[in-house]
């Protein structure tokens, strides 16, 4: 009798759970809706204030259907908000717009018969005398119109895109008119960007190359002072040698998605946070963000790794992780110390003579420190050069 009774109880519990999984629609009692279908929610990425500045999460390299991306500018904004971003640069290619032919075919009733796309792929060849007739400002405008509903700041931009081995790709940020960027001479395109007040970022410097050594074009671009920043990380690629270049040439550092598909496909479904450029600014206005970028108050974040200026990373860590003496052994004076991580960043710590330990977001670990000794460790998922990580010392 006991087994049938247990079965009845189990079935009753199952039915109860199933019943609780639905609710009656507030406007139509003939509809029941499942509680599992909830409103989309933003995944916050919590960071502390550092030296009085707010840490804004930015993606400075994204694409839409108006170049070779698979998503609209409006979707890019919503996606960024759900991913916890505060700042988004729309940087469609100037020289490559692979959807234009399909767009014209779709609009065949609106355009003269036989109208074909032209100069929509001039990465490896020059545009003819007709030039580029598409409105390269449209994707930025559409993103800006949507962004006001989400509190996201849009940085207008475009990617100057030439053959990757000899020339490379460069994002012009804070542009005034993307339609005025193109020139047959790639160097002149960079000059055009600078002339309208844009900051120029060197994108994925190792992409499709055998090293980060400068080809002749880059030597000229850097020597002329046309480059303001560099991607330390792009997608899943990390260029440790680029950190030293940023220090030497006084460039801001960044990490970006270079997203073409959806961020859910590339990051969320695989359990990752998307790449971010952390900008430490007084507020989220374009002026304040630009001031912070020009002052090099940026760090690169990708796949739980942070890279950039050593002192800024130390300041971020100090603001993120709090230490506390939990117990002092009265016999030998040895301290038991807790380290509490109050942020969304995961830290990999190595104490002297030990294997690395992971301090997860919003978690704490303990370690021991001898009498009258400081707490010392290295943060191994922070990089301030090709091989070096910040060394932290805390006096207890």
Where are these regions (language model features)?
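Sec-dependent N-terminal signal peptides
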Residues: 4-13
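N-terminal signal peptide c-region/cleavage motif recognized by signal peptidases
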Residues: 14-18
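Charged catalytic cores and adjacent phosphate/nucleic-acid-binding surfaces used
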Residues: 20-59, 77, 168-175, 210-396
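A metal-dependent hydrolase metal-coordination microenvironment
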Residues: 36-196, 203, 232-233, 237-243, ...
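Short, small-residue-enriched loops and turns at beta-alpha junctions
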Residues: 66, 207-211
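His/acidic metal-ligating clusters that form di-metal
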Residues: 199, 205, 213-216
